[in-house]
């Protein structure tokens, strides 16, 4: 679905910060590469991610999975690369975050992959990781929560930094 920003980024940040004050880590889940996504949507999404205070980010490219309406529609439109399941599960499992196994409507595959790599790497830059962990510690006085952010972030960072695109 489209990112619903009708209430503004500030209202989302208030919700996130409210939860964080209650010692809840916020994991932002973003899927890009839908048919409504184009370069402008990616730019707006990046601006949103630069201002929202997620502790952890899961940013990945849409994956049409067998048995879903999306998979059936893309198959009918002849936009799928992987059609031989379960054999193709191996390819999908190895590239779940960064793989583009269909033809996006308004973006080329490399643009989409490079964007995810760049934005994920930026979100998980060492400086930003430490900054988020420090903010968490100041808000919660919980070394465990701050350490959780550091460990999860450096693990996630590898996904984006090591992506071959």
Regions found by a protein language model. Name each.
Residues 1-141:
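A structural motif corresponding to the C-terminal lobe/cap of the Radical SAM core domain
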């Amino acid at each position: 679905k489209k990112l619903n920003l009708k209430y503004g980024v500030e209202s989302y940040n208030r919700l996130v910060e409210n939860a964080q004050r209650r010692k809840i880590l916020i994991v932002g889940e973003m899927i890009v590469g839908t048919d409504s996504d184009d370069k402008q949507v990616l730019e707006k999404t990046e601006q949103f991610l630069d201002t929202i205070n997620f502790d952890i980010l899961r940013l990945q490219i849409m994956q049409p999975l067998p048995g879903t309406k999306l998979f059936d529609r893309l198959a009918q439109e002849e936009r799928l690369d992987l059609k031989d399941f379960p054999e193709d599960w191996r390819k999908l499992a190895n590239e779940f975050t960064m793989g583009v196994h269909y033809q996006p409507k308004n973006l080329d595959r490399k643009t989409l992959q490079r964007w995810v790599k760049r934005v994920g790497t930026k979100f998980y830059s060492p400086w930003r990781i430490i900054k988020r962990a420090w903010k968490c510690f100041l808000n919660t006085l919980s070394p465990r929560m701050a350490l959780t952010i550091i460990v999860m972030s450096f693990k996630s960072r590898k996904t984006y930094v090591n992506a071959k695109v």
